[in-house]
C-alpha cells in the first residue's frame, strides 16, 4: 500500500458517518454488517488460516456502542467460518432493538455470551491465557474521556496479551487524534474501517483497511484522495 494513504481525525470520521447515513441513505444495520464481515474475513484469513496452530479459541470483547455491534457481527461470521468463539459483553446493550437482534443471532449460533463483570485484573488475565485471539471491539472512534470501569480493568489486563489482540477500527482506549495517551495495550493487528484514523498513523503491527461502503464522491467531498486504495482488489479489505 502506498505511503500517501489519508488518515482522518475524529471530526472527519463523524462527518463521513453522518453523510453515509444521511445523504447516502445507509442504515446503521448495513454499515455494521459490512464492517463486521470485513473484520471476520481479516481475522479468519490473515490470522487463523495462517496460524500453525489448529482449533484456535477466539474471545470477542464487546462494548455497548457501534464498535461492540461490529464485534457481535464479526463473532457470528467467525462462528459461521467454523471457529470457536466466545463473547464477553460486560455492559450489554438491551435498549436498542438492533443490538437485541444481534445478540439473538449470536445465541442462535450457539455462541456463549458472558455478561459477568469481574473485579480483578488477574481474573481477566486467566481468561485471556486460555484463548488464542482477543478481538477488541470495546470502543470505537467516538470514545472520549477517561477509561471507566468495568472497561478499565479489562483493558489493563489486555496489556499482558498484546500479541493476541486484533482491534476493530482503533485500539480501545486510544484517543482518535492523539493516540495511546493512557498507555494501554498496542495490538498485534488492527482493522481500520472506512479510512485509518490519525491514532494509527505510526502503528507497527499488521494493519488492514476495510469497510468498502464509501462512494468516491464522498471521499472527494472531504478532499481525500483514495482512488488507489482498492485498485485491482475485489475483496472487502486491503493490507496497509
Language-model features: where?
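Positively charged, low-complexity intrinsically disordered leader regions
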Residues: 1-55, 218-240
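Generic structural signal for short, flexible, solvent-exposed coil/loop and linker residues
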Residues: 2-5, 9, 15, 20-21, ...
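YjeF_N-associated NAD(P)HX repair module
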Residues: 7-8, 132-240
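Nucleotide and nucleotide-moiety/phosphate-recognizing core
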Residues: 41-138, 146-167
Amino acid at each position: 500500500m502506498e505511503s500517501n494513504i489519508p488518515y482522518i481525525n475524529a471530526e472527519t470520521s463523524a462527518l463521513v458517518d453522518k453523510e453515509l447515513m444521511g445523504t447516502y441513505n445507509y442504515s446503521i444495520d448495513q454499515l455494521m454488517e459490512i464492517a463486521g464481515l470485513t473484520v471476520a474475513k481479516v481475522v479468519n484469513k490473515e490470522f487463523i488460516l495462517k496460524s500453525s496452530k489448529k482449533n484456535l479459541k477466539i474471545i470477542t470483547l464487546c462494548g455497548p456502542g457501534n464498535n461492540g455491534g461490529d464485534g457481535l457481527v464479526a463473532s457470528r461470521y467467525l462462528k459461521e467460518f467454523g471457529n470457536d468463539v466466545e463473547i464477553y459483553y460486560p455492559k450489554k446493550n438491551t435498549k436498542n432493538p438492533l443490538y437485541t437482534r444481534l445478540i439473538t443471532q449470536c445465541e442462535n449460533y450457539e455462541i456463549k455470551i458472558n455478561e459477568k463483570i469481574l473485579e480483578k485484573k488477574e481474573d481477566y488475565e486467566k481468561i485471556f491465557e486460555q484463548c488464542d485471539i482477543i478481538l477488541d471491539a470495546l470502543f470505537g472512534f467516538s470514545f472520549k474521556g477517561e477509561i471507566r470501569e468495568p472497561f478499565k480493568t479489562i483493558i489493563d489486563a489486555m496489556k499482558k496479551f498484546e500479541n493476541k489482540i486484533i482491534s476493530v477500527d482503533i485500539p480501545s482506549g486510544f484517543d482518535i487524534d492523539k493516540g495511546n495517551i493512557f498507555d494501554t495495550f498496542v495490538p498485534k493487528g488492527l482493522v481500520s474501517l472506512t479510512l485509518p484514523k490519525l491514532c494509527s498513523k505510526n502503528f507497527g503491527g499488521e494493519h488492514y483497511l476495510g469497510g468498502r461502503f464509501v462512494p468516491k464522491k464522498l471521499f472527494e467531498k472531504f478532499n481525500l484522495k483514495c482512488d488507489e486504495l482498492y485498485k485491482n482488489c475485489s475483496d472487502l479489505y486491503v493490507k496497509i
